[in-house]
Amino acid sequence: MRNFKLLVGKEDRIIPELANQLGVKYNSNLGEYSLKIPSELGSGKVQGINFPNGVGLYIIRANFSKQIELELTNDEVKPLRFIYCLEEEFKHKFEEDNDWQTIEQYQHLISAAKQEQVQKLQFSANAKTEICYLEIDRKKFQDYLSFQLSDIEKNIYQLFADVNGIKQICAKGYFSLEISNVINQILSYRGKGFPRTNYLGAKALEILSQMLVIYQNESKPGEDEILKKADVGKIKIASDYIDDNLSSLENIPQISRIAGLNTAKIQEGFKILYNQTVNEYVKQKRLEKAIKLLTEGNRNISEVVLELGLSSRSYFSKIFKEKYGLTPKEFVKNSTT
C-alpha cells in the first residue's frame, strides 16, 4: 500500500503536493492543475481547479497497481467535501474510526473533518477508480454569496456555517445518475482556455446543486426511496438506450423490456435518479439533441423532427419554445445572423 499525506490550505496546493510525493511533474493552465499517475503505481490522471467562490473541483481517474490511501489534513481551511463515485467503489473514514465506510458506484459522500482531524480515502489495487471531488472553502463560499447564509434552509445551513470545523459531518448519499451525467459532460468537454475555466466552474456548481437536492430530500422525515444497486444499473441501461435511440423509441414498455424492469420500477427509478418521469427525460434529451442538430446547420427543421423520432412539427415547435423561449425557426435565424 502507498500512503500520501496532503495538507489542505488556502492555496491550490493539493495537486502540486501530490506531484511532489509521487515524484512527477504537474501541469498548470489558468488555475487548472493536472498530473499523470506514474507507471510504478498504475495509470491515470488527477486534475483539479479552485474557483474564487471557494469551490474546488477535482477528478481522479486511475487504475492503481497498489492500494492507495490519501490522508487529508486541514490547515487554516476547514473544508466541506462532496465526493462522488463514478466507477467501482472507494472507502472513507476519519482517522479515529475503527471501520471503513464503502461508497459504491453512483453514490456520494458529504463530509467535513473537525479541527486537526484527518480524513482518509482508500482506493483498491487493480480496480478502475473514478471519483469527482468538490472541496468547499466554507468561509470563501459564504463571502461570495449575495445574501445571508442564515436565510437558506436549516439543514443546508448546518453544512456550510461551520467555518471553524467544530462538528464532524459524514452523510452517505443515495444513488444518482444525474450527477454522473454532469461529470461525464466535464470529462468529454474539449474546450480550452478561458471558456473551459468558465465551463468547469458552472459544472462544479451544477454538481453541488444536485448533491444538495439529494441531501435535502434524504433529510425529509419518512424519506425511504432507495433503489438496489442492481436496479440502478438497469436504469442506466434504460437511459443509455434512450440517449442512443431517440429516433426509434416506441414506448415505455419497450424501454422496460430493454432494461429488464417493469414499467412501475422504471418510472420510480427515473424519479429517484433523474428527478423526472421517463417521458420528461425523453423530452429533455430530444430538445438537447435538437439544439445540437440545428446548430450544425446541415439539416432543415423537418429533418430534425424526424431524427428526433417525432411525427409532428407543430408539437416540436411547441415544446422547443416552451424550453428555450423561441421557435426552432427563430433559433435557426438567430444562429445564422
List PLM regions with ranges.
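N-terminal low-complexity or simple alpha-helical regulatory segments
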Residues: 1-78
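Alpha-helical bundle regulatory/interaction domains
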Residues: 2-6, 93-95, 100-227, 252, ...
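Conserved hydrophobic/aromatic pocket- or pore-lining residues that grip, position, or stack substrates
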Residues: 200, 242, 266
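Extended hydrophobic/aromatic segments used for targeting, binding, or gating
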Residues: 226-237
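Terminal helix-turn-helix DNA-binding modules in bacterial transcription factors
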Residues: 236, 240-254, 272-311, 333-337
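…primarily DNA-binding HTH/wHTH and HhH modules…
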Residues: 318-337
